[in-house]
């Protein structure tokens, strides 16, 4: 049986093997009686030639002659129960760049939308209550779309298997989820589960009223790939404006527990392997506060003090990520490095050629 | 004869007509004896219904019944000689985000390139003198590629016809030109003319030596769409390190004059129309300083004081643009608004989940 590694694994003992994502590992079922509990013995097909220490094997490399491959005794931590949760913040939102009055900047005298700067999206989706609603539920900027797509492509490069996608009902989160799935080439295979319980702390984002989010029908009409069979744990009607910090913390803690228990944890094969039946990553696209409020209860950490919380949340960039892996013991989770790197880029400022170039 | 408008034209007299890019205009050659010099008389097929004041016609709309169309006497400034030059700065370069030591951040212990942050390009092209050369000639970041592509798509939206593309020999400029052409869907139809005379003021960018730019053969091998028949006005060997401001100003002034005289100015058809034979836009992709040093001599303006110059250049963002249009009088150029809007976006900061989320 030949398996393909899903994640990198760094050896922690001399009888363990360095595994890169994409490595092909031969596992002989007859040999497994020698393996200690939770481990398997296998052989890596990866060449060990000094010249190509980082070579990654794919389907074709499988046909390399065995003389170029090295054979290594291999122990793999058997996490047949291992799951992972990737929590990410949405991409750049238009009001982050153009301020609260962004929509006014984009309306013609007769109320039509136009693109006042090339970072505004080329069009807005239809909303039953009119464009005005987008002031409380702003879309991604073009830069936000670029960021989301890039992260999706990077996850694909790392051969991360995403099996479930949950999103806050905020338009920017649904859009981010959609563009990440496009980058992953999983659109429309994996559908987005819109979970109102993932919305931002309402004290920050809904001080007077919960925004009129786009309905499932509207999202579908705008070509968003929504899972219509999904039943939310927290219906929209359960969200209240200006909730207390304690209420937000307990809502977040409840929703992450409900999400993880709704995604199957039993699987028949060893860890690291992208095979049907192996639980893939549960992707959750939500808000900057979600990176702490969803992962800390999962990892068994206490919630942050409400004052520290605001300060911490300000440091989280677009597409900032936290990654939790389930441990050998079921429902024990640990925060580890996300499967892809950070995304760091500069700002691009407004430019007035008349003042700058023509002026004397 | 039905013509399609290439640019918007705002009427300046009551016998002139508002024209949007894409409008179809019927011009009867028999009527032109009534037109004053430099103008033509024509009829707009655009509907004037109050409900759709901004409707833009395309090929299909051509078939609208005449009852929905309005007929207007039309005067068009006849700029049969009119050309336009669009000077743009390259996109975000990797060292702008990651500093001068960017390449060291991306090398494994055995000297292989890897992507230390997702804004680094996924690979570097081959260079005969090795990767080290890219330290003096850095590539675009992924964000820079996004910016370039977006501007190309916006030019296409505005139906701007680009007929000639010139680029500085700096890799970031050639890459920007290529991605703008891809956005314009003109790749590989329009080929890039690499002109060393367009390189940055060497006092800033080449204080000790002129960088080892990629050769034409290397650029072609890396799939850049280079015009191999182009003979540079300023060969690479003519560039000297640490040139004086006066030398830079006179080089820039000479190169823009040579470029405009090398691109045909005579054309048989009226202005605004994207027809074969009508001169399209001459696109020049170069450096922030080029926005002033190329356009000011073209528009007959004196060069800036060298101290003001440095201050002005710092204000120019990625893909900052200046646009010069030739006037009725040949070789008289005026700076006007570029055909597309500015691009303004925010920065994305580095993020350390361990310190931010896990720390207490």
Predicted regions and their residues:
Chain A
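Src homology 3 (SH3)-mediated interaction modules
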Residues: 1-65, 69
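Active-site-proximal alpha-helix that buttresses catalytic centers in soluble enzyme cores
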Residues: 9, 68, 76-189, 249-252
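Short glycine-rich phosphate-binding loop at a beta-alpha junction
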Residues: 161-169, 193, 267-276, 281-285
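Short glycine/proline- and acidic residue-enriched helix-loop micro-motifs
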Residues: 130-139, 223-247
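Short amphipathic alpha-helices and their capping/turn residues within compact interaction modules
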Residues: 10, 14, 24-32, 36, ...
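Eukaryote-biased feature marking scaffold/signaling PDZ-domain proteins and nuclear chromatin regulators
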Residues: 1-4, 12-23, 34-37, 80-82, ...
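Structural signal for hydrophobic/aromatic residues that build the beta-strand cores
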Residues: 5, 19-27, 40-42, 85-90, ...
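Acidic, low-complexity terminal tails and accessory targeting/binding regions
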Residues: 57-84, 94-103, 200-218, 265-266, ...
């Amino acid at each position: 049986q030949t398996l393909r590694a899903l994640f990198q694994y760094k050896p922690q003992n001399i009888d363990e093997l360095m595994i890169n994502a994409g490595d092909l590992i031969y596992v002989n079922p007859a040999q497994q009686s020698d393996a200690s509990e939770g481990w398997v013995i296998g052989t890596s097909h990866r060449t060990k030639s000094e010249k190509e220490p980082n070579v990654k094997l794919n389907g074709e490399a499988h046909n390399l002659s065995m003389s170029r491959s090295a054979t290594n005794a291999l122990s793999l931590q058997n996490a047949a129960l291992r799951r992972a949760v990737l929590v990410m913040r949405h991409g750049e939102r238009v009001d982050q760049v153009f301020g609260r009055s962004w929509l006014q900047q984009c309306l013609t005298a007769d109320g039509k939308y136009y693109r006042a700067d090339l970072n505004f999206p080329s069009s807005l989706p239809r909303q039953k209550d009119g464009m005005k609603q987008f002031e409380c539920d702003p879309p991604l900027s073009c830069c936000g779309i670029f960021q989301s797509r890039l992260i999706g492509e990077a996850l694909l490069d790392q051969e991360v298997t995403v099996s479930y996608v949950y999103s806050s009902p905020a338009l920017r989160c649904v859009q981010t989820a959609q563009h990440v799935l496009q980058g992953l080439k999983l659109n429309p295979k994996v559908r987005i589960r819109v979970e109102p319980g993932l919305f931002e702390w309402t004290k920050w984002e809904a001080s007077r009223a919960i925004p009129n989010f786009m309905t499932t029908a509207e999202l579908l009409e705008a070509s968003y790939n929504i899972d219509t069979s999904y039943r939310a744990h927290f219906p929209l009607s359960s969200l209240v404006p200006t909730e207390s910090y304690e209420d937000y913390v307990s809502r977040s803690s409840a929703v992450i527990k409900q999400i993880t228990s709704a995604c199957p944890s039993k699987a028949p094969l060893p860890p690291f392997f992208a095979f049907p039946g192996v639980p893939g990553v549960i992707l959750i696209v939500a808000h900057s506060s979600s990176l702490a409020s969803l992962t800390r209860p999962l990892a068994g950490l206490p919630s942050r003090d409400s004052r520290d919380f605001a300060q911490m949340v300000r440091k989280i960039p677009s597409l900032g990520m936290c990654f939790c892996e389930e441990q050998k013991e079921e429902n024990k989770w640990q925060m580890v490095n996300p499967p892809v790197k950070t995304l760091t880029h500069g700002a691009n400022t407004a430019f007035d050629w008349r003042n700058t170039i023509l002026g004397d």
